[in-house]
Amino acid sequence: MTSRLKTTILCVDDHWSGLISRKMLLESNGYQVLVATGGDEGLRLLLSHSVDAVVLDYQMPGMNGDVVAVKMKRAKSHVPIVLLSAYGPLPQSKLDAVDTFLSKSHPPKILLSTLQDLLNRRPRPFFSRWFNTWRSRNEGARQ
Protein backbone atom coordinates (compact mmCIF):
# COMPACT_ATOMS: atom_id res chain seq x y z
CA MET A 1 0.00 0.00 0.00
CA THR A 2 1.30 3.44 -0.90
CA SER A 3 1.93 5.73 2.04
CA ARG A 4 -0.02 8.93 1.73
CA LEU A 5 2.67 10.77 3.66
CA LYS A 6 4.20 13.17 1.14
CA THR A 7 2.06 11.81 -1.71
CA THR A 8 1.28 14.83 -3.88
CA ILE A 9 -1.81 15.09 -6.04
CA LEU A 10 -2.16 17.84 -8.65
CA CYS A 11 -5.78 18.95 -9.18
CA VAL A 12 -6.58 20.93 -12.33
CA ASP A 13 -10.04 22.47 -12.78
CA ASP A 14 -11.25 25.85 -14.02
CA HIS A 15 -14.13 25.86 -11.51
CA TRP A 16 -12.84 27.06 -8.18
CA SER A 17 -15.60 25.39 -6.12
CA GLY A 18 -14.83 21.92 -7.51
CA LEU A 19 -11.12 22.50 -7.13
CA ILE A 20 -11.42 23.51 -3.48
CA SER A 21 -13.80 20.67 -2.59
CA ARG A 22 -11.41 18.09 -4.12
CA LYS A 23 -8.46 19.76 -2.38
CA MET A 24 -10.24 19.53 0.98
CA LEU A 25 -11.25 15.90 0.35
CA LEU A 26 -7.72 14.85 -0.57
CA GLU A 27 -6.02 16.79 2.24
CA SER A 28 -8.44 15.34 4.80
CA ASN A 29 -7.31 11.91 3.58
CA GLY A 30 -3.62 12.63 4.04
CA TYR A 31 -2.53 13.83 0.61
CA GLN A 32 -0.60 16.98 -0.20
CA VAL A 33 -2.46 18.87 -2.92
CA LEU A 34 -1.37 21.34 -5.59
CA VAL A 35 -4.09 23.22 -7.45
CA ALA A 36 -4.20 24.77 -10.91
CA THR A 37 -7.07 26.61 -12.56
CA GLY A 38 -6.10 25.75 -16.13
CA GLY A 39 -4.09 23.41 -18.32
CA ASP A 40 -1.05 25.64 -18.78
CA GLU A 41 -0.74 26.23 -15.03
CA GLY A 42 -1.19 22.50 -14.41
CA LEU A 43 1.62 21.66 -16.83
CA ARG A 44 3.93 24.17 -15.14
CA LEU A 45 3.19 22.67 -11.71
CA LEU A 46 3.70 19.13 -12.99
CA LEU A 47 7.11 20.07 -14.38
CA SER A 48 8.25 22.03 -11.34
CA HIS A 49 7.07 19.73 -8.52
CA SER A 50 7.23 16.09 -7.58
CA VAL A 51 3.69 15.00 -8.43
CA ASP A 52 2.45 11.46 -7.76
CA ALA A 53 -0.93 11.68 -9.56
CA VAL A 54 -3.13 14.17 -11.40
CA VAL A 55 -6.88 14.76 -11.11
CA LEU A 56 -7.86 16.67 -14.23
CA ASP A 57 -11.12 18.26 -15.36
CA TYR A 58 -12.13 17.53 -18.95
CA GLN A 59 -13.85 20.73 -20.04
CA MET A 60 -11.74 23.84 -19.48
CA PRO A 61 -11.29 27.02 -21.50
CA GLY A 62 -8.24 27.20 -23.71
CA MET A 63 -7.19 23.56 -23.50
CA ASN A 64 -9.47 20.64 -22.66
CA GLY A 65 -8.31 18.00 -20.22
CA ASP A 66 -7.64 15.39 -22.90
CA VAL A 67 -5.14 17.73 -24.58
CA VAL A 68 -3.54 18.59 -21.23
CA ALA A 69 -3.28 14.86 -20.44
CA VAL A 70 -1.36 14.18 -23.66
CA LYS A 71 1.13 16.93 -22.82
CA MET A 72 1.47 15.70 -19.24
CA LYS A 73 2.12 12.11 -20.35
CA ARG A 74 4.78 13.33 -22.79
CA ALA A 75 6.50 15.13 -19.93
CA LYS A 76 6.05 12.53 -17.18
CA SER A 77 4.59 9.30 -18.52
CA HIS A 78 4.76 7.52 -15.14
CA VAL A 79 2.33 9.93 -13.42
CA PRO A 80 -1.22 8.50 -13.41
CA ILE A 81 -4.02 10.80 -14.56
CA VAL A 82 -7.69 10.67 -13.55
CA LEU A 83 -9.89 12.61 -15.97
CA LEU A 84 -13.17 13.98 -14.57
CA SER A 85 -16.20 15.17 -16.49
CA ALA A 86 -19.68 16.33 -15.62
CA TYR A 87 -20.84 15.54 -19.15
CA GLY A 88 -21.11 11.77 -19.10
CA PRO A 89 -19.07 9.24 -21.05
CA LEU A 90 -16.42 10.53 -23.43
CA PRO A 91 -15.29 8.90 -26.68
CA GLN A 92 -12.27 6.61 -26.36
CA SER A 93 -10.20 9.03 -28.46
CA LYS A 94 -10.47 11.54 -25.59
CA LEU A 95 -9.25 8.98 -23.04
CA ASP A 96 -6.10 7.65 -24.71
CA ALA A 97 -3.66 9.56 -22.48
CA VAL A 98 -5.47 9.06 -19.17
CA ASP A 99 -5.36 6.15 -16.77
CA THR A 100 -8.96 6.44 -15.58
CA PHE A 101 -12.10 8.38 -16.38
CA LEU A 102 -14.65 9.26 -13.68
CA SER A 103 -17.87 11.20 -13.75
CA LYS A 104 -17.93 14.15 -11.37
CA SER A 105 -21.19 12.71 -10.04
CA HIS A 106 -19.39 9.70 -8.51
CA PRO A 107 -19.19 9.77 -4.70
CA PRO A 108 -15.91 11.13 -3.29
CA LYS A 109 -14.92 7.68 -1.99
CA ILE A 110 -14.71 6.47 -5.62
CA LEU A 111 -12.12 9.14 -6.43
CA LEU A 112 -10.16 8.22 -3.29
CA SER A 113 -10.17 4.49 -4.02
CA THR A 114 -9.30 5.09 -7.68
CA LEU A 115 -6.33 7.25 -6.74
CA GLN A 116 -5.13 4.70 -4.20
CA ASP A 117 -5.38 1.90 -6.78
CA LEU A 118 -3.42 3.93 -9.34
CA LEU A 119 -0.75 4.87 -6.81
CA ASN A 120 -0.37 1.24 -5.72
CA ARG A 121 0.11 0.13 -9.35
CA ARG A 122 2.91 2.58 -10.07
CA PRO A 123 6.35 1.12 -10.52
CA ARG A 124 8.73 1.95 -7.74
CA PRO A 125 12.04 2.66 -9.54
CA PHE A 126 14.43 2.07 -6.62
CA PHE A 127 12.78 -1.17 -5.51
CA SER A 128 12.57 -2.46 -9.08
CA ARG A 129 16.28 -1.82 -9.69
CA TRP A 130 17.22 -3.43 -6.37
CA PHE A 131 15.00 -6.46 -6.94
CA ASN A 132 16.22 -7.01 -10.51
CA THR A 133 19.84 -6.82 -9.34
CA TRP A 134 19.16 -9.25 -6.47
CA ARG A 135 17.29 -11.65 -8.76
CA SER A 136 20.04 -11.67 -11.40
CA ARG A 137 22.69 -12.37 -8.74
CA ASN A 138 20.70 -15.18 -7.15
CA GLU A 139 19.38 -16.97 -10.24
CA GLY A 140 22.78 -18.55 -10.87
CA ALA A 141 22.94 -19.85 -7.29
CA ARG A 142 19.64 -21.74 -7.68
CA GLN A 143 20.64 -23.58 -10.86
Spans of model-derived segments:
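Active-site beta3 strand of CheY-like receiver
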Residues: H49-V55
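Two-component/phosphorelay signaling modules centered on CheY-like receiver
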Residues: W16-L34
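Receiver (REC) domain active-site loop signature in two-component systems and cognate sites
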Residues: M60
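Helix N-cap/capping motif at the beta->alpha junctions
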Residues: V35-R44, G65
